[in-house]
């Protein structure tokens, strides 16, 4: 595996930013591995939470080892405390993640540009971001996963007490019932269109303070007929749980969803 660090200037953000990327370098026992066939790599964009940054996944989990076993590239970008949205007063992170970042990553890394090979996941704030980005732009991603995500703001008591920047990010009216930021409304819009079917994975520990928010989102999504692979078990809002569940996310990506090169026949 190669661990690549990239600093670059973002035209959308108007400032410098960074990502880390894990790139398979040697073939595994998977006979269909992209590295064997010299084809562009399937890719997981992996998002961090509110109290961490783009380095957290490599610092607190064994994601590099897990990715090597799956022959998948992992791109871990930085988002500050933005909730992956175009802030009311601040940076346009949603535009950055849906437009600029994929183009830059595709230019610099040996990854596939095909929707069928592109996935997005995240924890906590990043779980919200993964679902927000995927539900808003299902043309870009084949699947999305949320680990302990902040998926239903209506279920979180006094979110501005947890995040003083709340009005700066979402504006004075907040995120609930906002068609650009409320995941329930985005799920309704997604469910009304069958143009880009997408697989969704959701998990949360039963002792997590976001457990009720996760159950509420799952209930609403199921009412809409959205098929979500859901897992729950004892667990809190901490890295031991996320290290375990990111393995579940990678296992959840069936091999027939990973791009295989066309045969010569």
Feature names for model-found ranges:
Residues 1-265:
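Non-catalytic cap/lid and distal C-terminal segments of serine-dependent acyl enzymes
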């Amino acid at each position: 595996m190669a661990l690549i660090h990239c600093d670059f200037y973002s035209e959308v953000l108007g400032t410098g930013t960074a990502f880390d990327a894990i790139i398979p370098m040697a073939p595994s026992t998977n006979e269909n591995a992209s590295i064997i066939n010299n084809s562009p790599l399937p890719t997981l964009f992996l998002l961090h939470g509110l109290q961490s940054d783009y380095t957290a996944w490599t610092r607190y989990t064994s994601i590099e080892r897990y990715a090597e076993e799956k022959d998948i590239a992992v791109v871990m970008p930085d988002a500050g405390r933005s909730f992956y949205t175009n802030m009311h007063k601040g940076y346009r992170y949603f535009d950055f993640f849906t437009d600029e970042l994929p183009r830059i990553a595709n230019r610099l890394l040996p990854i596939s540009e095909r929707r069928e090979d592109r996935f997005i996941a995240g924890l906590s704030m990043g779980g919200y971001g993964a679902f927000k980005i995927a539900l808003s732009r299902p043309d870009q991603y084949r699947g999305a996963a949320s680990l302990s995500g902040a998926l239903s703001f209506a279920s979180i008591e006094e979110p501005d007490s947890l995040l003083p920047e709340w009005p700066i990010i979402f504006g004075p009216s907040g995120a609930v019932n906002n068609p650009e930021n409320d995941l329930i409304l985005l799920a309704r819009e997604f469910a009304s269109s069958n143009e880009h079917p997408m697989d969704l994975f959701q998990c949360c520990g039963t002792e997590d303070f976001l457990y009720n928010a996760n159950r509420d989102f799952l209930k609403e999504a199921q009412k809409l007929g959205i098929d979500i692979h859901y897992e729950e078990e004892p667990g809190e809002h901490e890295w031991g749980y996320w290290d375990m569940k990111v393995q579940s996310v990678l296992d959840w990506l069936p091999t027939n969803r990973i791009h295989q090169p066309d045969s010569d026949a």
